[in-house]
Amino acid sequence: MPRRFDVIVIGGGHAGSEAAYASARLGARTCLVTHRRDTIGVMSCNPAIGGLGKGHLVREIDALGGLMGRCADAAGIQFRLLNRKKGPAVRGPRTQADRKLYRQAVQNVLFNHPQLEIIEGDVFDLNVENGTVKGVILADGQSLPSASVILTSGTFLRGLIHIGQTKIPAGRVGEAPSLGLSATLGRLGLRLGRLKTGTPARLDGRTIDWAQLEMQAADEQPVPFSFMTDRITNRQIECGITRTTAATHTIIRDNIHLSAMYSGQIEGVGPRYCPSIEDKISRFGDRDGHQVFLEPEGLDDHTVYPNGISTSLPESVQKEFMRTLPGLENVTILQSAYAIEYDHIDPRELSASLELKRLSGLYLAGQINGTTGYEEAAAQGLVAGLNAARTAGGQDVVHFSRAQSYIGVMIDDLISHGVTEPYRMFTSRAEFRLSLRADNADMRLTPIGIALGCIASDQEKRFKDYRHQIDDTINMLETRKLTPNEAAAVGIPVNQDGRRRTALELLAYPDISIADLSRLWPELDALDSKVAEAVEIHATYAVYMDRQNADIAATKRDEDRLIPKDFDYASLSGLSNELKQKLEKTRPENLSQAAKVEGMTPAAISLLIAFLNKGMLRHVG
């Protein structure tokens, strides 16, 4: 009798690790199937976590009890808060990470979870019965039954590495691709596409002349990702900065016909916001140089990652142009750069739970959905893991709104618009970024996590204490009032208009802090620094939030107006045949998604609302 699981996760990358951990936290009997146990949690490309938009996702994962934030804190060796001089809404926490420490941190959690079993193997096929996935079939013929399956294949689906004219079937360097699953997905009639990403060469740091380079230090006060991290204990390092030169550009231009991207050898589309050095030279040829960050990959590792210079040129050309960069005149390349193509599905095939609309029981997360980046993959893995476990347990799935989280923004973008290139998160993608800040991810999402049961007891207790302190402080500041003269007497300048202001109103002034107010109310001196910062940010944005809250409420109303799954759009009179076909193809779950269908007009939405209001939609039978 084969072992039976509630949830099987295919793949042990960032999406798979987060999915397996989320499922196991909910108590589901979870199995993670991966080619090699020792590669779970590996950082396949850049040795960094977070950044603009991406750091918000990591904070949200942590607020829901996930892995990535804690593991990044355990492995971080150069913490920097990006956009520090700008408003809190667009600040992005980031760290360079020690690859070995990060992998160990992920594995320490997963290997020791009682609800999680890890199996080494190659999933060759899915067991599908009557339109429902019932488990997986391994390449050795073994069948593993389960209630839900999560596919997190990364770049492994028909993965093909390109170095110049050389092609190597692989999911990443040294690991075989997954061929059977691509065939299965195609056989099931899913819309597949081809995308491309790339990674730069790895350099031997002992052969770099660091004395020539500008050095970038870590922040003096590291800002952790995880709510549960009190302080960063790793030694913090510097990274070097160099630039391409005219000689670099000449070599690349002279050999660009040998690039896999420019020879027509690659059919997949690459990420717009992480272009190869060939793209940079072709598209921005008038620049005198392009910045390259030399990022050490570990505290006891001499490998260096040259961020900003990915390529698919031949190895000989890579060596030639690399040595034209200042500081790299004698550099040794440890691993050549390469581009990799892989299959993905059209994410419009998915519901907001990340389950396939036409194949129940199968959830997808990560690069298979058309995204790029560790953080985007991990966030999807978390959602898929929670929903697969809840479905297996007979519970309703959970949806994350774009008004509630960057996770919701990303998923809504994917399932509403699909992708024509690898999708990357930016703060500019969110309409409600004043309220979707990295600093308040816990306040937005941890209560949801507590209700779902995916928050550990120590995190729940700490969060409730933290929220209680913030609420008490805000309430206190709302009850304390000052006249302009009283404020001026303690060095707090305000307009001399005679109006009494609350302490919270005063705190909204850009030059007034909790420390200033503590001259009047010394009890504020005792506030925890995180609580004080949270209260200051709350005061800063409070005046802007009324209008945004009204917009958020309108968005939520549209998201809450569900459209029956079996609605026959052909019967909806008043719409063009083209729009009916698009609605039939995308099958939006609610009004918010329907409004994003290409060609949808305000008149068409009004017609759909009228049908909903009049009860003319055919009910699910």
UniProtKB/Swiss-Prot annotation:
Record keywords, A-Z: Cytoplasm, FAD, Flavoprotein, NAD, tRNA processing
Record has tRNA processing as a keyword: yes
The UniProt entry, under SUPFAM superfamilies, shows:
FAD/NAD(P)-binding domain (SSF51905)
GO MF, one annotated term = flavin adenine dinucleotide binding
Q: Which InterPro entries match?
A: FAD/NAD-bd_sf, GIDA_C_N, MnmG, MnmG-rel, MnmG-rel_CS, MnmG_C, MnmG_C_subdom, MnmG_C_subdom_sf
Q: What PROSITE patterns does this protein's entry cite?
A: GIDA_1, GIDA_2
Q: Which GO terms describe its biological process?
A: tRNA methylation; tRNA wobble uridine modification
Q: Name one GO cellular component term.
A: cytosol
State the source organism's domain of life.
Bacteria
Location of this chain's protein in the cell:
Cytoplasm
**Binding-site residues for FAD, renumbered to this chain:** G11, G12, G13, H14, A15, G16, V123, S178, Q367
Q: Name one Pfam family in it.
A: GIDA
- Write out the residues that bind NAD(+): 270-284
What cofactor(s) does the depicted protein rely on? Answer: FAD
NCBIfam families assigned: mnmG_gidA
Name the family the entry cites.
Belongs to the MnmG family.
Role of this protein:
NAD-binding protein involved in the addition of a carboxymethylaminomethyl (cmnm) group at the wobble position (U34) of certain tRNAs, forming tRNA-cmnm(5)s(2)U34.
Subunit details: Homodimer. Heterotetramer of two MnmE and two MnmG subunits.
User: What PANTHER family does this protein's entry cite?
Assistant: GLUCOSE INHIBITED DIVISION PROTEIN A, PROTEIN MTO1 HOMOLOG, MITOCHONDRIAL
Q: What is this protein called?
A: tRNA uridine 5-carboxymethylaminomethyl modification enzyme MnmG
The encoding gene = mnmG
